[in-house]
Amino acid sequence: MKKAYPVINSVECKACERCIIACPRKVLQMSSKINERGYHYVEYRGEGCNGCGNCYYTCPEINAIEVHIERCEDGNTDG
């Protein structure tokens, strides 16, 4: 099975929460910490991402979130 996970740039995140709402697996949460721009930012809960990309596509900030999907040993991303 492929392992997917979001990578969040805490400096670029503006706490709009669109990614949290868009995530069907509810694996994102708002951090209690504040970034250098004065916003709380989104954090990954650590497991459960299915790699759907909803968070990436709904985020208005270009560099705030990416979804990484690890490749299998044969180089494919299908489990």
From Swiss-Prot:
* A Pfam family reported for this protein in Swiss-Prot or TrEMBL: Fer4_7
Residues where [4Fe-4S] cluster 1 binds: C13, C16, C19, C59
Record keywords, A-Z: 4Fe-4S, Electron transport, Iron, Iron-sulfur, Metal-binding, Oxidoreductase, Repeat, Transport
Q: Give the organism the record lists.
A: Methanothermobacter thermautotrophicus (strain ATCC 29096 / DSM 1053 / JCM 10044 / NBRC 100330 / Delta H)
The 4Fe-4S ferredoxin-type domain, residue ranges: 4-33, 40-70
Gene from which the chain derives? vorC
| Alphabetical list of SUPFAM superfamilies matching this protein | 4Fe-4S ferredoxins (SSF54862)
Q: What is this protein called?
A: Ketoisovalerate oxidoreductase subunit VorC
List the EC numbers from the record: 1.2.7.7
Taxonomy, top ranks, is: Archaea, Methanobacteriati, Methanobacteriota, Methanomada group, Methanobacteria
Q: Which GO terms describe its molecular function?
A: 3-methyl-2-oxobutanoate dehydrogenase (ferredoxin) activity; 4 iron, 4 sulfur cluster binding; metal ion binding
Describe its partners and assembly state.
Heterotrimer of the VorA, VorB and VorC subunits.
Which InterPro entries does the record match to this protein? Answer: 4Fe4S_Fe-S-bd, 4Fe4S_Fe_S_CS
What reaction gets catalysed by this protein?
3-methyl-2-oxobutanoate + 2 oxidized [2Fe-2S]-[ferredoxin] + CoA = 2-methylpropanoyl-CoA + 2 reduced [2Fe-2S]-[ferredoxin] + CO2 + H(+)
Cofactor comment text: Binds 2 [4Fe-4S] clusters.
Any idea which positions bind [4Fe-4S] cluster 2?
Answer: C23, C49, C52, C55
Q: State the superkingdom.
A: Archaea
Q: Which cofactors go with this protein?
A: [4Fe-4S] cluster
